């Protein structure tokens, strides 16, 4: 899929005595200007008497953090009142639960229904920057946990300080793409740009030891295609 100008794949699976079909092909959906991308695909034909030998093999190198993730239990914690959270994790440690990677879920960034991504300022109701710095130091330095924040660059709320309609992906009929509730889907290129821009600011302020990136691997590439004809890679699932 990453060597294709197509918008999405399609499948037709069929099995009968004289015929078997699996998968299908690709679709080239018109962009916002009504044009389609030039056809570009790469095909591999493999023959083998063993089924597993014809399956795609993608590079999957060992994570440099395997020594941490492989020896710890991960907990995505629904951050609430910080004093209550401190007491909770202090009690967990007293019971011997020490090898834990803990990440705040999106409620670390928000108090109510406001934006929870594309942010460098934590929820005011949880103490803002000072509250987050204090909590990060307590979780890591006092309790010894691996601890960090939530993030994603797939859900973008109109109340966010960086909001602009040109940040959002477009559907083929030039409408803003929807994402999680109260959010729109950022252009894929903006995810790369804003992660590089905001993550260093967050880390400089709070000195985390881990982070949780949500959603990106849960949404198929062809479900977040940007059809905005003005941008490079428009209409392609590879972009």
Put a short name on every predicted segment:
Residues 1, 99-239:
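Aromatic- and carboxylate-enriched substrate-binding clefts and catalytic-loop regions
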Residues 1-114, 120-126, 138, 142-147, ...:
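Carbohydrate-recognition beta-sandwich/jelly-roll modules
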